[in-house]
């Protein structure tokens, strides 16, 4: 489906963008466009890749004209540009709105205007029962995606989303922080050892995007089933792997953090399709004419639990070690 097509990745110099780019470099895409604000990161990527297939566009998703220009002639879009640091978004919530909501709306609106065939937007588990500005902004992005999917012609453009838990070793995540602390002989700083988080690799995140590109219907949200770990077990696993005797300091939760995360709400689980490795949350196809539902009669309401990092498969320390060994950053540290 990608032969001689053009792909654009917003936020393409970040962790997700890099992973997607590496997967698609040897594909049949005619051109891959990297759209981001940071000219230095683009220059570093250009020098590292030396690949004529990859084109670079400097711009900001907040600026509709810049993303509209970049999307001319594009067939597929992966929207990864975002503000994702929870504490920062707590202090600057309107910045999160401008990038994660308005910016995402700009991308989707420009995708529709330019006849992009498929546009997949990246969301997060923090969008489910959100308590922080980052999660709220991503929840709004999902709502915008679903609303726009109702209005655009699916024969021309299909909008969908992928929702992730914690992506291991991505920029700003805890594993690179722990690794730096252990290698420097510093104490490990843990917010709450009982806090649980989903564990997902960058490769798995790309697999999910590919699945969405190939299978999405308008308004779909795709979620990968993932194991989880406590932060305490993650820290212990890394200490043992690096044979470190660093002390552990519990510093308490940061602004906006939750004890556990949810990938699907109870309401979403009630209507989700179980696809084996993934869940598909279809868009609610009902309209605002609720009178007809009284005429049609009662509908049974199924009861489900939400899908959380507390009730999914829980990895112990040994299980976390096996999972961490899949990461390049860990293997490189052990071989150093």
Per-range role (PLM):
Residues 113, 143, 147-336:
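Strand-loop microenvironment adjacent to phosphate/nucleotide-handling motifs in alpha/beta enzyme folds
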Residues 79, 83-143, 147:
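Conserved Rossmann-fold NAD(P)-dependent oxidoreductase catalytic core, especially the SDR/UDP-sugar
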Residues 36, 58, 98, 192, ...:
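Conserved residues in the N-terminal Rossmann fold of short-chain dehydrogenase/reductase
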Residues 10, 71-80, 121:
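Rossmann-fold scaffold of SDR-type NAD(P)-dependent oxidoreductases
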Residues 28-41:
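Conserved glycine-rich Rossmann-like NAD(P)H-binding loop of the short-chain dehydrogenase/reductase
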Residues 56, 96, 119, 159-162:
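Hydrophobic/aromatic anchor residues within beta-strands of the central parallel beta-sheet
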Residues 55-76:
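Conserved Rossmann-fold cofactor-binding substructure of NAD(P)-dependent oxidoreductases
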Residues 5-27:
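N-terminal Rossmann NAD(P)H-binding glycine-rich loop of SDR-like oxidoreductase domains
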């Amino acid at each position: 489906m990608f032969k001689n097509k053009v792909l654009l990745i917003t936020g393409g110099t970040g962790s997700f963008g890099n992973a997607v780019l590496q997967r698609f470099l040897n594909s049949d895409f005619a051109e891959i466009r990297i759209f981001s604000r940071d000219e230095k990161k683009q220059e570093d990527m250009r020098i590292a890749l030396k690949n004529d297939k990859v084109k670079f566009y400097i711009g900001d998703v907040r600026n509709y004209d810049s993303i509209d220009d970049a999307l001319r002639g594009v067939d597929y879009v992966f929207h990864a540009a975002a503000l994702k640091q929870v504490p920062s978004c707590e202090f600057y919530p309107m910045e999160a709105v401008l990038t994660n909501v308005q910016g995402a709306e700009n991308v989707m609106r420009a995708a529709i205007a330019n006849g992009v065939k498929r546009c997949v937007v990246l969301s997060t588990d923090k969008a489910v029962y959100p308590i922080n500005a980052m999660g709220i902004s991503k929840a709004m992005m999902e709502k915008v995606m679903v609303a726009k999917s109702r209005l655009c012609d699916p024969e021309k453009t299909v909008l969908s989303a992928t929702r992730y838990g914690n992506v291991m070793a991505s920029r700003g995540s805890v594993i690179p922080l722990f690794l730096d602390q252990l290698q420097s002989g510093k104490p490990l700083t843990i917010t709450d050892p009982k806090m649980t988080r989903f564990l997902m690799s960058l490769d798995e995140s790309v697999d999910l995007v590919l699945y969405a590109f190939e299978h999405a219907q308008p308004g779909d949200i795709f979620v990968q089933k993932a194991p989880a770990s406590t932060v305490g077990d993650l820290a212990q696993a890394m200490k043992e792997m690096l044979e470190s005797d660093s002390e552990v300091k519990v510093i308490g939760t940061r602004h906006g953090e939750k004890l556990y995360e949810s990938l699907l709400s109870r309401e979403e689980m009630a209507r989700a399709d179980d696809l084996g490795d993934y869940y598909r949350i279809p868009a609610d196809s009902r309209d605002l004419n609720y009178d007809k539902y009284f005429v049609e009669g009662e509908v049974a309401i199924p009861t489900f639990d939400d899908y959380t990092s507390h009730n999914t498969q829980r990895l112990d320390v040994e299980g976390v070690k096996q999972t961490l060994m899949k990461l390049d950053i860990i293997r490189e540290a052990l071989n150093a």
